[in-house]
Amino acid sequence: MKKKILQTVLFLGIMFLTFYTLLHGQNLSEIYQAVKNMSVPYLIAAAGLALFFVCAEGSMIWYLLTSMRKKTDSQTTVLCVVGKEKVCSLWRCIQYSFIGFFYSGITPSATGGQPVQLYYMNKDGNKGSDSTIVLMTVAVIYKIVLVVLGVGMLLFCGGALKTELQSFFPLYLLGLALNTVAVAVVLAAMLFPQWMIVVWAWVEKQFIRLDIWKANPQRMDKVQTFTGNYRNAVDWLKQHPGKLIVVIAVTFLQRCSVFLLTYMVYLGLGQAGTSIQEVVLLQASVYIAVDMLPLPGAQGITELMYRSVFAPVFSKGSLIPSMLISRGLNFYFLLLAGAGVTAVSYTHLTLPTT
């Protein structure tokens, strides 16, 4: 309970400091008027892209869970039930995605989402092994697609990125490097699990020797479970390469949707003169730079970087409104929706069944 309270206080504190810093000294009435004048059709389109971002993950969870169900005999197929309601549906899987988004948004480095998703999936009656493989597959592909996009941007648009990002270019490189390391660790666990265990044993031994850690056999158990789960995911994907291609394609569209959202805001505020490619490139660079930072929802740094890199793109009076709308839709709007879905799901779990 204390940990949850601390996380909430940290989240709200960072949010308050972020918006205080950004709005201090600004003409709030002009900002309000600019936001109010946002084109409704473009606002709806931007909100739709934000919802698609979360729903796409839910659709992938549903697609993979359904595919794994088909591998078993019809007699052993498990139905998920909350109360008397069947919930092994696309809608329920989308709910898992909203729950994951909420907990990822309020925990540092987005570490809280998957464990809670797994908890609800297991409570609904999904096999723990299937749920683990599905969530790990979605997470791995998510990171791989992000790294591929980041490396591609660096190779083909490196000069433009360095010019546009200026002082934030090193942060982009750091974000890309951290994501690349994360992908490398996961791929090592998937493809070379025994090597991963040996390397971890050596690292743990050094930390114990330096009195940084105390001996704890549970650490190795967790690493073996970690590598074993990813190994199971690899084995399943090898047997279903077509499923992997579908997930990669949907993940790519999912990634691009949140980048395209900013361009909808750009058009909705009546801006012109900057191509869709440049707006998407800049938004993608912001996302990659902050993705692995240990801040709840990457608050603060996301807004500060946005204000810097998009300053030449938006007119002076539209820059802050554009940030409030785009960030409001792709994070805070989805966070509130996720909180609502989480509250309803928690109520279902705690209500007595008859």
Model features per residue range: what roles?
Residues 56-98, 265-282:
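Membrane-embedded helical hairpins/re-entrant loop segments and their flanking transmembrane helices
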Residues 212-228:
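Short, membrane-interfacial amphipathic segments enriched in basic
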Residues 38-46, 235-248:
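Membrane-interface helix starts
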Residues 1-29, 33, 100-213, 295, ...:
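Transmembrane helix-loop-helix hairpins in multi-pass inner-membrane proteins
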Residues 350-354:
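A short, hydrophobic C-terminal helix/tail in secreted or cell-surface proteins
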Residues 31-34, 226-238:
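A short amphipathic helical element positioned immediately N-terminal to and/or at the very start
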Residues 1-70, 74, 84-87:
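Anchoring transmembrane alpha helix of integral membrane proteins
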Residues 68-72, 266-325:
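Membrane-interfacial helix-loop connectors
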